């Protein structure tokens, strides 16, 4: 097979490909065997029409479409490798010519990754934040744990005060009509928590258990439900009970109840260790981000619109997946923010351009420094994934191969190695 490469304007390349006659004849024969299965001609059984008769009746072109599908996709991939290019979009295939006993030819125009002009990417002397876990940090974690193990207890209190937990039934109306989400029974509300519409909780202070009261509020103009925003509402509220929160003492008994440790000091040590690890991770990520930002800024590259759109697609898919975990559709979420997909993409275009440029720069650095990913590193990563998911590595690898995601995993490992390289050569000791 012969391949000629021509650089076009921008980041486009044209490949002119010539496929050897033997391969062409084999493809035409395969195409014939496929087409003839559905052909009926008087004098021949269905599927048994000779090729010369088939071509005489319908023309030789009857086999060309299937021969194209057999020949061109693999030939294009071989041409890409031979030309040593990295396409970033689907090719435009033109000028396909095929005839028996002759070479087949076609042209493919495709957008490729642009050249990256690297700037300084070593010796930048970037500082990593110092990590310190204070007593206040530990106390905050203990307080959070304490809150989680607190319980609401019934009380004989009659009058609602700030900080009380009240059990209420309520029904809300707007212009005398009930509205969706405006009523509930046996609802636990912490007075003063700001959970409800502004003004609602304050009007409960001083009210008595068993008392039915009316609460008048106005929904904020920026309220999430647009049909309620800015409207006046009246809630009929039945105060059924006042509860108080019982918070456990911070002692060894609490440590035993709330953790796997026997003493409060052991629990504190564990909290300190976990907080230190979390802060170290954050400091490392911040350092990595600063280094990647700097080396990206120092590089020159024209980022193709195709890569920006690909990045936006990925960001949008991630957003949709994240929102779905809350039982929402991404369209509804964007609508609540006053956006649609088009306006969201416009708002995030600058970030997508930045990410696309960073990816190109990291790949260029990795290539220049000869950074490669070994089969052993891929297997180790698969074992790590399998361990986290309590599955067998063989199952994970088979799934990745089936989904065509093995190359994606390899690229993820590659990028991680490049970032580790950059940290090693840019962090101040």
UniProtKB/Swiss-Prot annotation:
Gene3D superfamilies per record: 3.10.50.40, Trigger factor ribosome-binding domain, Trigger factor, C-terminal domain
Job of this protein: Involved in protein export. Acts as a chaperone by maintaining the newly synthesized protein in an open conformation. Functions as a peptidyl-prolyl cis-trans isomerase.
| One Gene Ontology term of the molecular function aspect | protein folding chaperone
According to the entry, what is the taxonomic lineage of the organism? Bacteria, Bacillati, Bacillota, Clostridia, Halanaerobiales
Against InterPro entries, the record matches this protein to: PPIase_dom_sf, PPIase_FKBP_dom, Trig_fac, Trigger_fac_C, Trigger_fac_C_sf, Trigger_fac_ribosome-bd_bac, Trigger_fac_ribosome-bd_sf, Trigger_fact/SurA_dom_sf
- Whose protein is this, by species? Halothermothrix orenii (strain H 168 / OCM 544 / DSM 9562)
Keyword annotations for this protein, in alphabetical order, are:
Cell cycle, Cell division, Chaperone, Cytoplasm, Isomerase, Rotamase
Q: What is this protein called?
A: Trigger factor
* NCBIfam families, sorted: tig
Q: Does the keyword Cell cycle apply?
A: yes
The EC number of this protein is 5.2.1.8
Write out the similarity annotation. Belongs to the FKBP-type PPIase family. Tig subfamily.
* Enzyme class, UniProt record, top EC level: isomerase
Which reaction(s) are listed as its catalytic activity? Answer: [protein]-peptidylproline (omega=180) = [protein]-peptidylproline (omega=0)
Q: Where on the tree of life does the source sit, at the highest rank?
A: Bacteria
Q: Name one GO cellular component term.
A: cytoplasm
Q: Which Pfam families match?
A: FKBP_C, Trigger_C, Trigger_N
Where is this protein primarily located? Answer: cytoplasm
Q: Name one GO biological process term.
A: protein transport
Give all residue intervals belonging to the PPIase FKBP-type domain: 163-248
User: What domain comment accompanies this record?
Assistant: Consists of 3 domains; the N-terminus binds the ribosome, the middle domain has PPIase activity, while the C-terminus has intrinsic chaperone activity on its own.
Where found?
Cytoplasm
